[in-house]
Amino acid sequence: MIRKILQTETYRKWEKKLKDPRARKMITARLYHIANGLFGDTSPVGEGISELRIHYWPEYRIYFKQEGDIIIILLCGGDKSTQDKDIQKAKEIAKRVEVDEL
């Protein structure tokens, strides 16, 4: 089953700022795998939010929540150096975002 991946504006802005084309390709490939049900290296961070780890320097993190079996909402992204701040931001965004808004 292919999952639908939705992105918040915060996530889109973060991804657009990435200057490293290899990192962008790695993230795109990882999202393709997720859409096909292959989540790989993920870990729950609380309040229904999970962290997707991309093993590339710097170690990128993408925060998401899943609603049902078909929708994944990309809340925000960052790297290891901003991890704590990004987790808090993801939790705040998750509280106010609605699937039908994306």
Report residues per predicted region.
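A short, surface-exposed loop/turn module that caps and links secondary-structure elements
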Residues: A29-Y56
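Short low-complexity stretches enriched in small and charged residues
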Residues: D20-P21, M26-Y32
